[in-house]
Amino acid sequence: MAISTPMLVTFCVYIFGMILIGFIAWRSTKNFDDYILGGRSLGPFVTALSAGASDMSGWLLMGLPGAIFLSGISESWIAIGLTLGAWINWKLVAGRLRVHTEFNNNALTLPDYFTGRFEDKSRVLRIISALVILLFFTIYCASGIVAGARLFESTFGMSYETALWAGAAATIIYTFIGGFLAVSWTDTVQASLMIFALILTPVMVIVGVGGFSESLEVIKQKSIENVDMLKGLNFVAIISLMGWGLGYFGQPHILARFMAADSHHSIVHARRISMTWMILCLAGAVAVGFFGIAYFNNNPALAGAVNQNSERVFIELAQILFNPWIAGVLLSAILAAVMSTLSCQLLVCSSAITEDLYKAFLRKSASQQELVWVGRVMVLVVALIAIALAANPDNRVLGLVSYAWAGFGAAFGPVVLFSVMWSRMTRNGALAGMIIGAVTVIVWKQYGWLDLYEIIPGFIFGSLGIVIFSLLGKAPTAAMQERFAKADAHYHSAPPSKLQAE
């Protein structure tokens, strides 16, 4: 399609704004702690929106509305599962992880935290977890770059090769320059843009059809199954869709936001903000797909692109219902969703290399400035590898991204959850949980037993592995138990205000 000047200008202004934030963050980045975790200085608002934006990729504005448009409201079970999982993660893990990482050598990364928490002198936990992060997040990054390239390709009529670099360049620049603060501040802007788009668009769709009741009648007339929450689903299918929520406990880029909060007491505010944002965004995405059924049913002449690819429902509605300036802002929300997740994943990969491999094994005495620049170079290296993988969007390696959410959820999720909740957990328990969870996901996905989403057995067996191997081996050292007790007491300490952190 021919790109309009207003849309092009809007995209360029947005991208320039993100890069400008990167330069502002650069001025506040004094050491490696600042570059990787923002000096643990994020307030509740930035913590909340950064966690949300880093979580919700382009799937929120393309995949979810497309699935609802194609199959009806029954596809919303995954949104319900994600909402529940995110809330439990905020409630049980967020504040505790913020405290425990600080009490365990001020850990900057998950591998660093595992090493300190379980006094792993062999550093096996650090190596395994860092390599798992590098493998899957590099592929994750490649997948995000493909999504950004597809957006530029379809919106601006670019070749895929040009779109590949155009889509990735801005994210790489502001992440390279500003590190964690740039990523978190841009996430906040991007999250605001996403919620604006997902509230405004379905409202205008409903108005365009003739109101809520009229829209619902049109949807029912097309197929009554569109409003059936149980359409084509059995108990296992519903549990599998809901099971996506288990992934939150083990996603390094989301957990990093908890670790970067200025205090565990501010987590309660952040939870309320983040969950409100998430519920509104998911409801908006579902509404875009759901009421899009009514709009395109009433306007079949406009439905060609959507009928060919249901994931374009948000894009087409934005271009049809709004003038090019507003449409440009709304379509920037898709780019925001892609960029916010990609930048977080690039930074997690960079920190895994710099903190958990370079500093831990090669340069223990490296200066803060050296680590910051190594971190920046690693952002660039990982990005270039991801771009190389994304150069062929049909690359089989990209298929491994389907393992990533379940893999992280099952391998890291139980370990993180038990590590902040159970003082009796040991290094062998952590290692067993990580390996059993990951292997279960891989094997279960290959054989597809019971048609059950592999994260569920992976999480269950990983948890059992933690408990069994922790109880079979030696008890944690006195120092480990004392450190856990101090961290737990600090977590439950009274906040400065009357608001309780629990």
UniProtKB/Swiss-Prot annotation:
UniProt record, GO biological process: cellular response to proline; proline transport; transmembrane transport
Residues flagged as site, Involved in high-affinity binding for sodium and proline: C344
CDD domains named in the record: SLC5sbd_PutP (cd11475)
Record GO cellular component, one term: plasma membrane
UniProt GO MF annotations: L-proline transmembrane transporter activity; proline:sodium symporter activity; sodium ion binding
Keyword Membrane: yes
Disulfide bonds: none
Induction pattern: Expression may be repressed by PutA in the absence of proline.
UniProt cross-references to Gene3D superfamilies, sorted A to Z: Sodium/glucose cotransporter (1.20.1730.10)
Main subcellular localisation: membrane
InterPro entries found in the cross-reference section: Na/Glc_symporter_sf (IPR038377), Na/Pro_symporter (IPR011851), Na/solute_symporter (IPR001734), Na/solute_symporter_CS (IPR018212), Sodium:Solute_Symporter (IPR050277)
Keywords, in A-Z order: Amino-acid transport, Cell inner membrane, Cell membrane, Ion transport, Membrane, Sodium, Sodium transport, Symport, Transmembrane, Transmembrane helix, Transport
Transmembrane residue ranges: 6-26, 42-62, 68-88, 127-147, 163-183, 192-212, 235-255, 276-296, 320-340, 371-391, 398-418, 430-450, 452-472
Location of this chain's protein in the cell: Cell inner membrane
Membrane topology summary: Multi-pass membrane protein
Catalysed transformations (reactions): L-proline(in) + Na(+)(in) = L-proline(out) + Na(+)(out)
Family: Belongs to the sodium:solute symporter (SSF) (TC 2.A.21) family.
Protein purpose: Catalyzes the sodium-dependent uptake of extracellular L-proline.
Name of the protein in its database record: Sodium/proline symporter
Species this protein is from: Salmonella typhimurium (strain LT2 / SGSC1412 / ATCC 700720)
Lineage: Bacteria, Pseudomonadati, Pseudomonadota, Gammaproteobacteria, Enterobacterales
Gene (name only): putP
